[in-house]
């Protein structure tokens, strides 16, 4: 009877609610319906804020400016030298290195929404954002500071990420960001680390086995499968879930342990100038899962909107974020990923969309 009354009183709302229940809108990788996100986040954030954290937490970005002529020359020279059959899918695609000024907004989101961060490191290849003035809070780290020169220059994110623990003065607890990941709302340090130092493991609902069965062929999947195989062989622990495409809480000591235990495996791919299907992805899979095996990470929830920056759908996601902002129901984060330059695009202009969304969070 109540449903009948609702239908006659507000037929539009009745139909909307019926469709949302039967076909829920899902914008994240943990497969949480949009209308349930806020319930989970409110309770999670309340719990994560209860116990203060008294240790320093840093943030690390990796970044490249593909408009830099000197960098472009190095990139083109080495791109011509690689064997196309040896590198992974899209490994040399220009989209992997495209700079839409995302770092400006990602960094701004960290400064605005994570004010408790001690220091921010930006790992680059002889570059510095034109709009940024480095300081004690925000430091530029060159590839030569952390990677042996015999492996440089490198255009392989897996190689760069394998050396993050060598950043001078880096805290034991740090959060790794790609520059296409953005904090969407204020978050406590407890979202990333417990007060006893345990890291959050932001698991996705995706399955490595299913992705492989469907024929997915990317360096990321190959690196995850290889990492999972090594960990399963040594610890009899089967891992089938990648992480959500968002920031990654990490422990420097687990990086160092990875190098002690698996130096030969790690050194085997350091000479790969571009990503291949024979790499390991330390920062985004191997170290987080080894942390879990060692008891210093626990599965946690991060609701991250993940979308293709080149797709016309990007505007739809930003509209959803704006609506959520007005309602106070924003997700934890979002990732505007630049998939590949061969995809058709309606020129969603991600820079314009970011500038509108982060009107008051830009740094420079």
From Swiss-Prot:
One of its GO terms (biological process) is polysaccharide biosynthetic process. Its EC number is 2.7.-.-. It holds the Pfam family Stealth_CR1. Disulfide bonds: none annotated. One of its GO terms (molecular function) is transferase activity, transferring phosphorus-containing groups. The keyword NAD does not apply. InterPro entries: Stealth, Stealth_CR1, Stealth_CR2. Keywords: Exopolysaccharide synthesis, Transferase. Part of a group II capsule biosynthesis locus. Belongs to the stealth family. Stealth proteins are part of a protein family that is conserved from bacteria to higher eukaryotes. Family members were first identified in microbes as proteins that help pathogens to elude the host innate immune system. Microbial stealth proteins are involved in the biosynthesis of exopolysaccharides. Stealth proteins are predicted to function as hexose-1-phosphoryltransferases. This is Capsular polysaccharide phosphotransferase LcbA. It comes from Aeromonas hydrophila. The gene is lcbA.
């Amino acid at each position: 009877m109540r449903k009948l009354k609702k239908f006659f009183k507000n037929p539009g709302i009745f139909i909307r609610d019926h469709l949302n229940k039967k076909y829920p809108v899902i914008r994240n990788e943990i497969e949480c319906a949009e209308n349930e996100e806020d319930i989970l986040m409110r309770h999670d954030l309340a719990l994560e804020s209860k116990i203060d954290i008294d240790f320093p937490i840093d943030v690390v970005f990796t970044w490249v400016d593909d408009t830099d002529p000197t960098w472009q020359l190095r990139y083109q020279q080495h791109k011509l030298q690689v064997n196309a059959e040896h590198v992974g899918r899209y490994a040399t695609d220009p989209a992997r290195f495209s700079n839409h000024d995302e770092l400006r907004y990602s960094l701004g989101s960290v400064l605005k929404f994570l004010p408790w961060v001690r220091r921010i490191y930006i790992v680059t290849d002889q570059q510095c954002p034109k709009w940024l003035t480095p300081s004690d809070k925000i430091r530029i780290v060159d590839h030569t500071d952390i990677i042996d020169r015999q492996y440089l220059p490198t255009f392989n994110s897996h190689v760069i990420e394998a050396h993050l623990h060598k950043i001078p003065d880096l805290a034991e607890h740090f959060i790794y960001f790609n520059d296409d990941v953005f904090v969407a709302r204020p978050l406590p340090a407890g979202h990333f680390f417990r007060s006893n130092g345990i890291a959050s493991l932001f698991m996705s609902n995706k399955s490595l086995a299913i992705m492989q069965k469907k024929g997915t062929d990317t360096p990321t999947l190959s690196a995850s499968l290889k990492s999972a195989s090594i960990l399963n062989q040594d610890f009899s622990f089967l891992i089938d879930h990648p992480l959500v495409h968002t920031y990654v809480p990490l422990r420097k000591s687990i990086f160092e342990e990875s190098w002690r235990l698996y130096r030969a495996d790690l050194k085997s791919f350091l000479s790969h100038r571009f990503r291949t299907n024979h790499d390991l992805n330390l920062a985004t899979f191997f170290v987080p899962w080894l942390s879990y095996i060692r008891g210093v990470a626990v599965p946690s929830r991060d609701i991250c909107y993940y979308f293709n920056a080149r797709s016309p759908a990007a505007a739809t996601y930003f509209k959803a974020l704006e609506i959520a902002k007005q309602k106070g129901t924003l997700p934890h984060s979002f990732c505007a990923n630049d998939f590949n330059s061969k995809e058709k695009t309606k020129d969603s202009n991600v820079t314009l969309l970011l500038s509108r969304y982060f009107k008051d969070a830009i740094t420079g």
